[in-house]
């Protein structure tokens, strides 16, 4: 089934963030860059939201702390240390796939900072549980936002339905006036325009 104008593609996932971004922070990504070829994508953010906005860079492999820091120093925002920079592995690819079906304002990329670049050491026994706790805490805030979006979309759908019903009535009335006055198509269009506006 093709998505409707009220449907959304939401990518909710984990990412690494610059050290100035606390673990557990939820960010809405306003710029996605695919590091392999440098292509950049801009999801339209047309909705009020409680999140920080950030740039996200998608790498083809996991970034350890050293390579992540080199990337930050060399490429991403080296001049502005306060800039919110995130890295993941999938957002740019999801945007490109979603772009076939969704408009830029229908795609949201919500990322939770779970680390500041991985370490080379093997993961500790509790690290999976710690990751789940971070994502679960962030999910509450994200779900609240998604519920607000859905409420807004339902309201917009009802308004669109009412407008469509009104337009249909106006069209019928314009046709009746055209027939009664033996008017042309141009006259019918003028009657329709005067009724609508």
Predicted segments, located by residue:
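Glycine-rich phosphate- or other oxyanion-binding loops that anchor nucleotides, phosphorylated ligands
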Residues: 1-197
